[in-house]
């Protein structure tokens, strides 16, 4: 069984998020989605997150793409999760191109194309 993992805040879940989750799911047999905790978002300077972590988890669950959802709560958790779950592929949006290459030591890293015309800055009014 090929396991894929991806991470995100998934605030105000939109078509771009859904497309990314679908593409990540298509890479393997089992998709693990890491949703950032409220405190981890604040630590990283994401102060305008509208939905709390439970609302964001529920939105991801409702897409039907996630086989398992975990909460990302600390720096370094990606490596821990990859090893703990026996992940084969780490997938993330291409806007992070190169940023997660250090994970290639642990699994394959795939940068998925963004959905053109979708911007959270256009959604936050």
Where are these regions (language model features)?
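Nucleotidyltransferase catalytic core that binds NTPs
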Residues: 1-122
């Amino acid at each position: 069984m090929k396991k894929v993992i991806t991470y995100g805040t998934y605030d105000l879940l939109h078509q771009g998020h859904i497309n990314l989750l679908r593409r990540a799911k298509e890479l393997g047999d089992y998709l693990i989605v890491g949703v950032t905790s409220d405190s981890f978002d604040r630590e990283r300077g994401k102060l305008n997150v509208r939905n709390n972590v439970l609302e964001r988890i529920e939105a991801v669950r409702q897409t039907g793409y996630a086989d398992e959802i975990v909460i990302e709560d600390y720096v370094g958790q990606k490596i821990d999760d990859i090893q703990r779950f026996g992940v084969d592929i780490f997938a993330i949006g291409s806007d992070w191109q190169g940023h997660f290459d250090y994970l290639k030591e642990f699994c394959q890293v795939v940068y998925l194309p963004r959905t053109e015309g979708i911007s959270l800055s256009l959604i936050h009014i």
